[in-house]
Design a protein with these regions (language model features):
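N-terminal signal-anchor module of multipass membrane proteins
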Residues: 42, 66-67
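Active-site-facing alpha/beta catalytic cores
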Residues: 70-71, 75-324
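Non-transmembrane, aqueous-exposed alpha-helical and coiled segments at domain scale
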Residues: 318-319, 325-345
Length: 355
């Protein structure tokens, strides 16, 4: 019998790659504060993403997920957010024109502050210190004070994520995502880079289409869809106390949502069927990404998918494949066939992380 799910039922499971907070009272104060903070995303937006992912599963859309391996406090700057957003938009226009389907844009942004490590200890010369686990947990500087697991960093991460999401919303709906503007960026890229020359013919065709649309009176001035775009945020749901603090009930449906992101994923190191991360993710209504590596056991993977998506909901599961170009053609097709043949799994998506 499956135990009753709550945002904290994962605490009864083995939780790997979690920080060791020595000051428990401080941790409780931080979590109490986080629970009172506004959500970063809304349930309706999450449902919109799930619907878009469902279209991808039916071959009527394409998922583009891109962003840094990890965000940092030190490199936080509006120009970096703008440039990342801009590149994703440029990629999406090329992909959409070439494929003829809508591109679902998901950034690894506004929350990707924690990373699992192969070893909990880092050694330099004769000094051993806790490994750097991401700015949400400790500092990258190699000294005792920096490497302490500090719960206050969760509040710092939230503040940066909130600022990032606020700017992304402004970019997405404030005119910066105008299709004609994106095309000018692409044309500039074609002219100024060696790599861009490969896309010259495609870029010219897009320009011709935009020119024709303009001659027909179809421009961003009178068609809102040409000046705005949907943009979603995602991160790895690694630090479970943080994720739990932002898991709220949607007043319109009664369902639970992790409001720290539109989509979260489970990493290759935390994908255990009876582990804490799978337990947490099985109860939230967000789309869930699952990392798939070259050593993944498809039988175990099917069990994990069934645990998280027992009702075979469309748009719920996203497979994030990390195998490299030399292995993906040999390994992944067989895994995908096995997964599709399993009754609990009908809708999966493939996304390739970029840096």
């Amino acid at each position: 019998m499956t135990q009753k799910w709550t945002p904290f039922s994962w605490e009864s499971k083995v939780a790997l790659h979690q920080p060791n907070y020595l000051d428990k009272s401080k941790l409780m104060k931080v979590l109490k504060k986080l629970k009172k903070l506004p959500p970063l995303v809304f349930a309706g937006e999450v449902r919109d993403l799930k619907e878009s992912l469902s279209m991808c599963g039916d071959g009527k859309g394409f998922l583009l997920q891109a962003g840094d391996c990890a965000e940092s406090f030190a490199e936080f700057h509006p120009n970096y957010i703008r440039d990342t957003f801009r590149v994703i938009l440029q990629m999406s226009v090329i992909l959409s024109f070439a494929s003829g389907v809508p591109i679902v844009k998901v950034g690894r942004l506004a929350g990707q502050f924690a990373k699992p490590r192969s070893s909990p200890i880092e050694k330099k010369n004769d000094v051993k210190l806790p490994s750097y686990l991401g700015d949400m947990i400790n500092g990258i500087e190699f000294n005792q004070n920096s490497r302490k697991h500090n719960p206050d960093r969760m509040v710092m991460a939230y503040n940066q994520a909130a600022s990032t999401q606020n700017l992304l919303r402004a970019f997405a709906y404030g005119g910066y995502a105008d299709l004609s503007r994106i095309q000018r960026w692409n044309l500039d890229f074609v002219k100024k880079s060696k790599q861009g020359s490969k896309f010259k013919l495609l870029a010219d065709r897009i320009s011709e289409c935009l020119s024709f649309m303009s001659s027909c009176g179809i421009t961003s001035k009178n068609v809102r869809q040409l000046s705005e775009t949907n943009f979603f945020i995602s991160h790895e749901a690694l630090l479970l106390p943080y994720e739990s603090a932002f898991t709220r009930v949607d007043s319109t449906t009664g369902d639970w949502y992790d409001t720290s992101a539109h989509m979260v994923w489970i990493g290759d190191r935390t994908r255990q069927l009876n582990g804490a991360h799978v337990e947490f993710c099985r109860g939230i209504s967000n789309p869930i990404g699952i990392k798939v590596g070259p050593t993944s056991d498809y039988k175990e993977l099917i069990k994990v998918i069934k645990r998280i998506n027992p009702n075979n909901e469309k748009g719920k599961i996203v497979l994030i494949v990390r195998m490299g170009a030399s292995k993906i053609e040999k390994i992944f097709p067989n895994i995908l066939r096995k997964i599709k043949s399993a009754k609990p799994v009908s809708y999966t998506h493939l996304t390739l992380p970029t840096k």
